[in-house]
């Protein structure tokens, strides 16, 4: 949900956050707009807004004003008030959602996953807006709880971040990830823009369109996680990846928070691998055991890199934080620290409370992924999800 964010999430019982920060201004590409044209449609049950020449059609409970707050490849995000609940939400319009089957499945996956999950550190879906016509719709509108900004915007800003801020963000990412992994799910696309924040420093993980079941071993051709946060086993095309891929991403994100620039900003796959080996060193034969022969051969023909001292490279970072990061940025995923052990690491002693780090009691069922769904079937499944929120719109 790039760039989509403003209004606090529900108050939590979590450990008190460090001092908050002012909400980020709207994205420069999406200036605030007064008096966006609005027209009632379909007998007054819907409202059409005209935003930058795009039709944005939602149920009539989302009364004016409506504010564009973000834009991505998928479409546009607006903040709006639900007049029935008085809650502000971020509504993402996915335009032409069924033109591409892979994208349509991503949308369905995200909806089903977020409806299954219930956790303070995972963004919640508040509504799937039903289409006016059951059998003739191409756009999907999803309303999420509204947050103020995301970690990418904060890192790029000149907003001061204390070590306590960074530590608290790290804790919340791991707390959310514990729940995700306990649901038998890998996120697979953790990066700063997928971590939403509000002014209280509450953090919520979003964008589950690439999530996968943890026991799945076939490599997905659609897998396009941002290169900079990608674990070495994925860069080397290992099909047998585990929850450890998310832990690697968290290590990269934390160091980016501390240093205000990406840890491994690779230009391509080859450069990405070189950057990470320049820091953590060329893996030993023992550390290569989990890889296939092609990947082993590739690593062996690279020039050897000695391991650098992360402490020397980042002298201002707390020694306990360095110790945890070294355990996260371990080449061999079998030896990489788990989320549970990371939460229990001494660096997070002041925040860790196992009684307030819930797990998901029912694993997520990805069975719908196993069927070759037609466009009409995917439309029907998304329509049913919309009816779960809006039974009165049954047609």
Swiss-Prot record:
Disruption phenotype: Reduced sensitivity to abscisic acid (ABA) during germination. Insensitivity to ABA in terms of root growth inhibition (e.g. root cell division and elongation) and stomatal response leading to increased water loss under dehydrated conditions. Delayed senescence phenotype. A motif (TXY) lies at residues 221-223. Interacts with MEKK1, MKK1 and MKK2. May form a ternary complex with MEKK1 and MKK1 or MKK2. Interacts with NDPK2, AP2C1, MKP1 and PTP1. Interacts with DSPTP1B/MKP2, especially during HR-like responses triggered by fungal elicitors. Interacts with MKK4, MKK5 and MKK6. Binds to LIP5. Interacts with VQ4 and IKU1/VQ14. Interacts with RACK1A, RACK1B and RACK1C. Interacts with PTP1. Interacts with FLZ9. Binds to BASL and YDA. This is Mitogen-activated protein kinase 6. It is found in: Cytoplasm; Nucleus; Cytoplasm, Cell cortex. Changing residue 368 to L: Increased kinase activity, and confers the ability to induce ethylene and leaf senescence. It comes from Arabidopsis thaliana. Belongs to the protein kinase superfamily. CMGC Ser/Thr protein kinase family. MAP kinase subfamily.
């Amino acid at each position: 949900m790039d760039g989509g964010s403003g209004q606090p999430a529900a108050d939590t019982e979590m450990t008190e956050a460090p001092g908050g920060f002012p909400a980020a201004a709207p994205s420069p590409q999406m200036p605030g707009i007064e008096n966006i044209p609005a027209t009632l449609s379909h007998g007054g049950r819907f409202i059409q807004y005209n935003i930058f020449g795009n039709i944005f059609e939602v149920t009539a409970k989302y009364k004016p004003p409506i504010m564009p707050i973000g834009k991505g490849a998928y479409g546009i995000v607006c903040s709006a008030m639900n007049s029935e609940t008085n809650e502000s939400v971020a509504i993402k319009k996915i335009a032409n959602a069924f033109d591409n089957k892979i994208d349509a499945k991503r949308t369905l996956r995200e909806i089903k996953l977020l409806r299954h999950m219930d956790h303070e550190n995972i963004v919640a879906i508040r509504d799937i807006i039903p289409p006016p016509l059951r059998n003739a719709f191409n756009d999907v509108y999803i309303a999420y709880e509204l947050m103020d900004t995301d970690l990418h915007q904060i890192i790029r800003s000149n907003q001061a971040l204390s070590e306590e801020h960074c530590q608290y963000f790290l804790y919340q990412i791991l707390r959310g990830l514990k729940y995700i992994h306990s649901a038998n799910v890998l996120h697979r696309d953790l990066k700063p823009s997928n971590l939403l924040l509000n002014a209280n420093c509450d953090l919520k993980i979003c964008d589950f369109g690439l999530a996968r079941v943890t026991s799945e071993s076939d490599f997905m051709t659609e897998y396009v996680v941002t290169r900079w946060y990608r674990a070495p086993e994925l860069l080397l095309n290992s099909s047998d990846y585990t929850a450890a891929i998310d832990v690697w991403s968290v290590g990269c994100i934390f160091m980016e928070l501390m240093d205000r620039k990406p840890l491994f900003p690779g230009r391509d796959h080859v450069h990405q691998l070189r950057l990470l080996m320049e820091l953590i060193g060329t893996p030993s034969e023992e550390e290569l055991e989990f890889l296939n022969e092609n990947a082993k051969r590739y690593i062996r023909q690279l020039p050897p890199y000695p391991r650098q001292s992360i402490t020397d490279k980042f002298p201002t970072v707390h020694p306990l934080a360095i110790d945890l990061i070294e355990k996260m940025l371990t080449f061999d995923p079998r030896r990489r620290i788990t989320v549970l052990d990371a939460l229990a690491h001494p660096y997070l002693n002041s925040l860790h409370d196992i009684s307030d780090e819930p797990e998901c009691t029912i694993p997520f069922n990805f069975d719908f992924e196993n069927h070759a769904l037609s466009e009409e079937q995917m439309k029907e499944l998304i329509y049913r999800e919309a009816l779960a929120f809006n039974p009165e719109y049954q047609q």
